[in-house]
């Protein structure tokens, strides 16, 4: 299958269900054999920090699975710093993306054939 998707997660702190669904959609696409990547940007960097640190939540296990599978492509370096989650993000070992003035590049993914989804 030639379809590829990149999900940019911008869900705010009070939109945990939206961020969790990004993980679920990524898992579904991956399990169906469709290439998928997750990029946490904007307020979504706080969601990533929460997935990593809230070990009692079901989303933590899904986060770990997506990380292990290499589905999580990265997190915005600028936003991680500005939103005060730079240290928790650094501890995840997930690449910090900074191609466009400290932010991840959506064009890079489009040029690689990915269809973007923004949540």
Predicted regions and their residues:
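Mid-chain, well-packed structural core segment of small domains
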Residues: 55-96
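Short, glycine-rich nucleotide/cofactor-binding loops
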Residues: 6-20, 47-53
């Amino acid at each position: 299958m030639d379809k590829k998707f990149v999900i940019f997660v911008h869900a705010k702190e009070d939109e945990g269900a939206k961020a969790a669904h990004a993980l679920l959609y990524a898992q579904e696409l991956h399990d169906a054999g469709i290439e998928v990547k997750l990029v946490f940007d904007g307020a979504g960097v706080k969601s990533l920090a929460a997935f990593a640190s809230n070990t009692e939540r079901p989303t933590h296990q899904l986060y770990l699975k997506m990380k292990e599978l290499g589905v999580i492509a990265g997190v915005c370096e600028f936003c991680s710093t500005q939103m005060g989650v730079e240290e928790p993000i650094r501890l995840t070992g997930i690449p910090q993306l900074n191609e466009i003035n400290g932010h991840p590049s959506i064009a890079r993914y489009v040029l690689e054939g990915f269809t973007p989804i923004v949540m």
